[in-house]
């Protein structure tokens, strides 16, 4: 594939912050190209926790990952005539010549006047449970993310983990599953205090500190999980219909070193205008790093218009690019 069209702004990453940035760029009259390495848009909320309840999005007392992405896509559809989407493409390098970036991907190349990086911390993969025969049961009834709470109705569910996702899934499944057991290798959980309070008020069987030892099952179907109490000989075999491993996800921004921008670990250093060290390239959301950074979707949503407006000013330095309110830009 060779893309000859020159876009105003290319957004690397199709998660919630990238989708919002694309909408805002469309609102400002820009042509936009979204390049996403995965097979669908939405990033982690869509793929890892579509049914997980989210409470910290402004004006939404409660939503889910799936609902959030669905609404962002509906919003973006308004500008479908000026927004292109390329899925399953990994951005490898980009280089500017005569004011135009040539973006090389795993499928070909794209041309753009400016780039906004919104790829979070890069590609992600689940951290394993760490027992010998784990792969025998993976993605059967041993799961690393939850797509539907209904799939656990009436089942004996064991969850391994101690962070926000593990505690949240335990709380959400309480009352849906026949039983829920949460095991964690430490006494204290790393989740939000309120979520932990709800956990101990629920009927979830909390087992701490325990570590997984062995999965038993037949024909790829896990039937029990054996756990051992830390610093003890006590061993417990837990019957399971479903095992959810919630040890978090490892991320990989391996191509970052080829993008010619300053970065620390897996995040790109930006200034107050979300400019990177390379002129015409901006970074927002989980991809951006600056003093006082808070890694929340809501924060990334606020960063996006700033970066887009800076990109427009870069593209059209002599243009009338002063930001205006959306009510002045959209006529129903």
From Swiss-Prot:
Its cofactor is FAD. It is an enzyme of class 1 (oxidoreductase). Its EC number is 1.18.1.2. One of its GO terms (molecular function) is flavin adenine dinucleotide binding. It catalyses: 2 reduced [2Fe-2S]-[ferredoxin] + NADP(+) + H(+) = 2 oxidized [2Fe-2S]-[ferredoxin] + NADPH. Keywords: FAD, Flavoprotein, NADP, Oxidoreductase. This is Ferredoxin--NADP reductase. It comes from Streptococcus thermophilus (strain ATCC BAA-250 / LMG 18311). The lineage of its organism: Bacteria, Bacillati, Bacillota, Bacilli, Lactobacillales.
